[in-house]
Amino acid sequence: SIVTKAKDLNMPAVALTDLGNMYGAFKFVREALNHEIKPIVGCELYVAEDRLKQKFTKDNPDKRFHQVLLAKNKNGYHNLAKLSSAGFIEGLYGIYPRVDKALIKEHKDDLIALTGSLSSEIPHLILNVGEKQAEEAFRWWLDVFQGDFYIELNRHGIPEEDRVNETLLSFGKKYGVKYIAANEAFYTDKEEANAHDVLL
């Protein structure tokens, strides 16, 4: 499991950020505490322009990006749970429980936001739209989360990440935003790669 692997690696803390849901949070927290590891509960939310919109066309499809939020404390956990629940109750489209920026802003207290991976808003804008638009989005997240907004640097061996990281670091320098190193982990050992591919 994630927790036993973290213990083997002498990690003081470990985070769980499942896509769109928090089903594993209770078991994860219990296991982490049993192993004397600090659990960080998070969620990688699907963020749409309007979570309530249900009608789309080929020319105007449902556009959504991934957004990692981490709970700082119990209140943050409750806000994260509200966001995740609203995604299913109000924003479910197909298999995607969606939230939007207005809802995130409403429930932002005691949550940490990261710039995210290539499937997140700011990296997507850097690569596909322009740095000006990416900087505008960066400033929105910074204005909302202030000191609880962090740049996430990824290195999965994907060439596009180098450009994203360089641009994010320049934004960080300009606005005084701190950064963390993170990689998405979908399994704990490379021997599990084939099983993960089968699940996909």
Functional labels for PLM-detected ranges:
Residues 1-200:
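Phosphodiester-processing cores and adjacent nucleic acid-binding clamps
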